[in-house]
């Protein structure tokens, strides 16, 4: 019986887009560039592309977080300290947590059926900070963050680490997440079934 649920965080149960949008607006205001707050979708596109590159092992996390703002500012034709602005954005993000609609009920339903482990490629400070802001860190039987493991989804080594340290037998696990490229592809590579759970709608290619 598959009753060990390996549950993704961002855009599966956590409303990352809301947290990110608010943090971006505050960072732009802090930098004296309030007019750019309305260009969040442009920043998001750059950020998403870099995270995909991270999943493929093409960039490091430390370079990604600064490069996203450097590219955004370059596209907007403005000069700014990308590292400083990222620091402001990230600091706000770490304390700004929201659940997606229905996430609390979904989490309770999973917990009633078995054990729930959070698996995420996010940064520890951002993930733990938002979970603590919501008061739900203790609702999980284990939390696995890529930066603490040394490998990121969809790398099979990420999942092997989870199986070994949960502890959870592979044959008892199922992955639930919103990303085809990290959650679903990672589950396939690790030899476990998966459920595409996308509250905002089924992504292209599903």
Where are the language model's segments positioned?
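Active-site neighborhood of HAD-like aspartate-dependent phosphohydrolases
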Residues: 1-45, 74-75
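Asp-based, Mg2+/Mn2+-dependent phosphohydrolase catalytic module
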Residues: 1-5, 17-18, 80, 104, ...
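An amphipathic alpha-helix signature
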Residues: 21-25, 62, 66-70, 124
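A general structural signal for well-ordered alpha-helical segments in protein cores
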Residues: 40-43, 66, 159
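A metal-dependent, Asp-based hydrolase signature
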Residues: 49-88
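Short, acidic loop-to-helix structural element flanking the phosphoryl-transfer center
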Residues: 62-66, 83-117, 156
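Conserved phosphate-coupling serine/threonine residues in phosphotransfer and NTP-handling enzymes
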Residues: 120
């Amino acid at each position: 019986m598959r009753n060990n649920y390996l549950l993704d965080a961002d855009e599966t149960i956590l409303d990352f887009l809301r947290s990110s949008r608010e943090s971006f607006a505050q960072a732009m205001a802090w930098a004296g560039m309030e007019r750019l707050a309305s260009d969040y979708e442009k920043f998001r596109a750059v950020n998403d592309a870099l995270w995909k590159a991270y999943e493929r092992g093409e960039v490091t996390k430390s370079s990604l977080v600064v490069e996203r703002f450097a590219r955004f500012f370059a596209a907007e034709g403005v000069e700014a300290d990308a590292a400083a602005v990222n620091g402001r954005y990230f600091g706000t993000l770490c304390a700004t947590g929201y659940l997606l609609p229905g996430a609390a009920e979904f989490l309770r339903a999973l917990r009633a059926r078995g054990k729930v482990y959070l698996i995420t490629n996010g940064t520890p400070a951002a993930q733990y900070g938002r979970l603590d802001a919501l008061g739900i860190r203790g609702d999980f039987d284990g939390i696995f963050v890529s930066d603490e493991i040394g490998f990121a989804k969809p790398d099979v080594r990420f999942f092997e680490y989870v199986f070994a340290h949960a502890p959870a037998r592979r044959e008892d696990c199922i992955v639930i997440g919103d990303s085809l490229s990290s959650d679903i592809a990672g589950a396939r590579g690790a030899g476990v079934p998966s459920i595409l759970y996308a509250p905002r709608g089924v992504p292209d290619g599903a």
